[in-house]
Amino acid sequence: MSALALTRCGQRDRLGLKGPRAAEWLVARGIVLPTAPNSWTHSQESDGGGSILVARLGQVEFFLEEQADGTTLKAIAPSLNQRLQGVYPVLREDSGFHLSGEGTDAVLAQVCNVNFAALTLDSHPVIMTLMIGVAVLVVPQVGAARRGGAAGLGGAGEVEYRIWCDPTFGPYLGESLGAVVSECGGRYTGVSG
C-alpha cells in the first residue's frame, strides 16, 4: 500500500452538459457513455491519445474530464455554443482532488456520511454528496484500472478517489480535508498534472 495522500489536481479540460439529446450529441462525437445513471467510464480519445473520464449524473446530465494533455474536449466544446436543440451546456470549473493510499476510508468516514468502504467498485459508481459541508462529486477507482488519471499517485489495486467541488469551495475543501489527511498520518500536496 502507498502512503496516504491528498493532492490538488492541476487544471484539466472539463465539460458539462445535460438535456434529452445530450447522450446522442456525445455519442455522435465518438464519446463512450456509461449506460447506468450515477456511474462512470473512460472513453478513449479519437486521435488515440489519452482518455476522458465520463460520468453520467442521472439520466440526461454528463460530466467529462480529460487527461492533462488531451485535446478532444477543447475541440468539441465550442459547438455547444450553437444553441443545440435538447443539449444544454453546464459550466464546469471544478476544483479537483485525488485521495489515495492506506487510510482513505478512515479519512472519508470522518468527513462524509457515505460508507465508501462498502461500495461495489465494479459498478463504477459516481457519488454526489456533502463532504465537510461542501457539495462534491466523487469517483472511486481501483489503481490498476485507472486510465487518464495522475499516474503514480496510488499503488496497483488500491482504491483511489477523484473528488470535485465548486471552485469557490476548493481552498476550503482542500485545507479541511488536507488537515484530516495530516491527522491520519498522510500528506496534502499542491497541484499535480
Question: Can you describe what each PLM-predicted range is?
Answer:
Residues 1-193:
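Basic, glycine/lysine-rich polyanion-binding surfaces/domains
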